[in-house]
Amino acid sequence: MLTVSRLIPRGQGLAPVLRQRASTVELDWELRQKSRLSATDSAGRALGIFLPRGTRLRGGDMLVAEDGSLVRVLATPQPVLLISACPKHGSPFDLTRAAYHLGNRHVPIELQPDHLKIEPDPVLADMLRALHLIVQADNLPFEPEGGAYAAGQGGGHGPHGQHTHPHH
């Protein structure tokens, strides 16, 4: 078993050719939340992944194995609920309201400009439909937000120092 104990978030600093040549490992959200797991990469190698506790892997992250080889993490498609505003009876604000209610329930949620994604839950699906949202089951990669205390694990904000807004 090949030991992996180093993570390069989103492959930052690596040449694109290195990211493209790397073997891949496909993991769903449940597995990407674990800091210790076994997996098999696209080259058929057994991997023992041992990362610092609390580490969450994201699609596009690069793992460095003990032999120096690189493994690119892929967010594998998994069952999700796709939530969107009803074009006839709703408004884009309905998604904001849905995100608020889901956040109050501490539900892992992927935020997109025109839709939300959550893991399947029939009770939440009924609640969202009652809010006049369209809820569809699908099989897609799931990349939920890291949350307020995720130490940079969330999507879109980037590492500190690479943005220009003032801090008060």
Curated annotation (Swiss-Prot):
Predominant location: cytoplasm
Localisation per UniProt entry: Cytoplasm
This protein's GO CC annotations: cytoplasm
Any GO BP annotation: urea metabolic process
UniProt keyword annotation of Cytoplasm present: yes
InterPro entries xrefs: UreE, UreE_C_dom, UreE_N, UreE_N_sf
Keyword vocabulary terms for this entry: Chaperone, Cytoplasm, Nickel, Nickel insertion
Any GO MF annotation of the entry: unfolded protein binding
Segments of this protein annotated with the region Disordered: 145-168
Known role: Involved in urease metallocenter assembly. Binds nickel. Probably functions as a nickel donor during metallocenter assembly.
Family: Belongs to the UreE family.
Name of the molecule in the record: Urease accessory protein UreE
Species, as recorded: Verminephrobacter eiseniae (strain EF01-2)
Gene from which the chain derives: ureE
